[in-house]
Regions:
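Active-site gating loops and adjacent loop-to-helix segments of metal-dependent hydrolytic enzymes
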Residues: 74-107, 144-166, 222-249, 269-272, ...
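Catalytic core of soluble alpha/beta enzymes
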Residues: 220-250, 255-268, 281-292, 306-317
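Metal-coordinating catalytic core of metallo-dependent amide/deamination hydrolases
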Residues: 133-256
Length: 437
């Protein structure tokens, strides 16, 4: 190890193949951080409180899901095979108005956290209502989260008076700043078409004042862009630029219908973009110009979006589909190599959420968010390289998960949650939805 002390480390993972190489290696964790990484052949004696044998496994950084509406697990499969506006207006918004409560957000976010942890996601950017309940669920589950309170210009769950929406978001951020080192509060405006100019400006200002990220859905559909041009004479990105809302702490989610000028504005302002390939495919919204975004060196993360438009939270599935989608569309198999996508789901996603430099790499001094993948799986055999994981990875191969040095999944069991209880609570809520729908 690179330091001379002999205090035991908290957790030592041994004999695993490291994502950075092929020889068996080890990772030592202390105080929530990676203390040392190296080859087994060169490992000094390291006393450890707990040791995990990762023989036959891959040790890799945890995945970062840059966009989710975790509590929407309740609406998984509720209204499938519909266009976005009809899906939202006729099904999702009415269901939210009736069934979203603090209890629902807590338990359904816990279910999402379990699904994410058990599929190798260690950090999530979430955006919803009653976000204090989501933040509590993430804290209890031990997942790292950027939890953003939703802002929208009509009566919303927990904020019946739209004029109070930004104040409610400010209060949420103040309540959660510094409460749990794994939870970063943030602010989410639903979109430029559901939030007026004053709301957008005030919400961004609240985020700037608190020093937290600002999220919003941008240019998800062709209809949204046409509407924006009609109302504002500008694309959604151009409109946000005119309002002074684009900077490196603004995260534009979806970015499906971006033109060259939009991408230039995003690049110039240093704004981040999150792509959600499966959600955009399912709702037939289109596909984001990911190769062009990367060519402009725009910061990009990958998200699943909410369960209701995916319908799972498995980021490995997202990676494979994201890679295949663009190759098929461009008729170019060299577009978006597998390793580049895995970067976006780890270190790229971390940077996108303002956690860059601290997360997403197997390096001493990084936050200890790790996943142990069982390579003794038919789909991962033989394992020539990391590409195999991108094209063949799945939740079922995730064996152990560590977040901030804490073991949260061990031998495919979530240690932080009573999963049968979580499932039972969500089923109870679903029975109400079924009876009322």
């Amino acid at each position: 190890m690179h330091h001379a002390d002999h205090h035991p480390v908290d957790l030592l993972l041994t004999d695993g193949r490291l994502a950075t190489g092929t020889a068996p290696g080890y990772v030592a964790i202390r105080g929530g951080m990676i203390a040392a990484v190296g080859a087994m052949a060169e490992m000094p004696p390291i006393p450890a409180v707990e040791t995990i044998d990762a023989t036959g496994c891959l040790i890799m950084p945890g995945l970062v899901n840059c966009h989710n509406h975790a509590a929407m697990t309740l609406f998984r499969g509720l209204a499938d095979d519909l266009p976005l506006r009809q899906w939202l207006t006729d099904h999702i918004f009415p269901a939210e108005a009736r069934f979203v409560s603090p209890e629902m957000v807590y338990w359904c976010s816990k279910l999402a956290a379990a699904e994410m942890l058990m599929s190798g996601t260690t950090t999530v950017a979430d955006a919803y209502f009653y976000e204090e309940q989501a933040a509590q669920a993430f804290s209890d589950a031990g997942i790292r989260a950027v939890a953003a309170q939703g802002v929208i210009d009509f009566p919303a769950p927990g904020v019946p008076e739209p004029a109070e929406n930004v104040a409610a978001a400010r209060r949420f951020v103040a309540a959660w700043q510094g409460r749990d080192p794994r939870i970063t509060p943030a602010i989410f405006c639903h979109s430029p078409y559901t939030c007026g100019r004053e709301t957008l400006v005030a919400a961004k200002q609240a985020a700037v004042d608190a020093g937290v990220p600002f999220f919003l859905h941008v240019a998800e559909t062709a209809g949204e862009v046409a509407e924006s041009r009609a109302h504002h004479g500008r694309t959604p990105v151009g409109y946000l630029h005119d309002l002074g809302l684009l900077d490196r702490h603004t995260v534009c989610v979806h970015g499906v219908w971006l033109d060259e000028a939009d991408m230039d504005l995003l690049a110039m302002s240093g704004s981040q973009v999150v792509v959600c390939p499966e959600s955009n495919m399912k709702l037939a919204s289109g596909s984001a110009p990911l190769p062009e975004l990367l060519a402009r060196e725009i910061g990009v993360g990958i998200g699943t979006d909410g369960c209701a438009s995916n319908n799972n939270l498995d980021l490995f599935a997202e990676l494979a589909r994201g890679a295949l989608l663009h190759k098929g569309q461009r008729l170019d198999p060299t577009v978006l190599p597998a390793t580049r996508l895995l970067e976006l789901a780890t270190v790229g996603g971390a940077a996108c959420l303002g956690l860059g430099g601290r997360l997403g790499r197997l390096l001493p001094g990084s936050l200890a968010d790790l996943v142990v993948i069982d390579l003794a799986h038919p789909r991962l055999t033989p394992f020539y390289g990391i590409e195999t994981l991108v094209y063949g990875g799945a939740a079922s191969q995730v064996r152990d998960v560590v977040v901030g040095g804490r073991l949260v999944v061990r031998e495919r069991r979530c240690l932080t949650l009573d999963l049968p209880e979580v499932l039972a609570r969500v089923r109870e809520l679903a029975a109400q939805v079924r009876a009322g729908s």
